[in-house]
């Protein structure tokens, strides 16, 4: 099942998104500096870029499953693309180490995971069908203009 159909699916998606963000950018703490698996893998040729693309792809897929707004998915895709391009700077002679350090410092996965989680928080997910009382209540609030959140029906 690709699209989330229940609040349990949404809970699992959120856990997955947070896990990817934390593993990528928040595993080891050196005072105010936080490093993750991505920063360590960045210094192995091509492994950091492959990890970045896979982890970023998983974040985008989970965002699609949670039906976050397209603008959020575009921003996440942009961040992951920029992060991957920075990481490929090691292919240019003379700037390899600088590019590796910049890629390790750019926390694109954590930022992207936080953007997806925030978009999920700003969405009212309704589990049910058109005949349910909750559906009618939300529809009335939307028509009256009192519901300011984005509404997504899971059923």
Residue map of PLM features:
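Feature detects long, helix-prone N-terminal segments enriched in hydrophobes
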Residues: 1-155
